[in-house]
């Protein structure tokens, strides 16, 4: 519950900051990543969790992102190409948020 509450707190902070500082030209956005292949999760993944996630990956076709894919979303948000984006939460999760 604490993890979920903290994530939603960051969403609110992103939007509030965008509202407050947007008039001064400050853009505030967030990226909501799904699983990323960093290797950090491997020691924490229990056999039970692996048994639940593995079949989901195969049936739904979801993938674990490479760090470069997540970085590309962040680079886009920092670029002039996203100059009209403010207060957004960009999912970079390969479809995990719709499952």
Over which residues does each language-model region extend?
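Cytosolic ligand/metal-binding cores
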Residues: 1
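Active-site helix of classical SDR
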Residues: 6, 14
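Short, small/polar-rich loop/turn modules that mediate ligand/substrate recognition or access, typified
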Residues: 22, 27, 85-87
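A glycine/serine/threonine-rich, flexible loop-to-helix segment
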Residues: 23, 35-60
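Conserved SDR Rossmann-fold cofactor-binding beta-strand/turn motif
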Residues: 27-37, 78, 91-93
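C-terminal substrate-recognition "lid" of short-chain dehydrogenase/reductases
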Residues: 64-92, 97-98
């Amino acid at each position: 519950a604490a993890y979920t509450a903290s994530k939603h707190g960051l969403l609110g902070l992103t939007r509030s900051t965008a509202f407050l500082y947007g008039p001064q030209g400050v853009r505030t956005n967030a990226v909501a990543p799904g699983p990323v292949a960093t290797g950090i999760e491997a020691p924490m993944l229990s056999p039970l969790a692996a048994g639940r996630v593995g079949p989901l990956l195969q049936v739904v076709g979801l993938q674990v992102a490479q760090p470069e894919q997540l970085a590309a979303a962040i680079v886009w948000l920092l670029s002039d190409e996203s100059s009209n984006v403010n207060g957004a939460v960009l999912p970079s999760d390969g479809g995990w948020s719709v499952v």
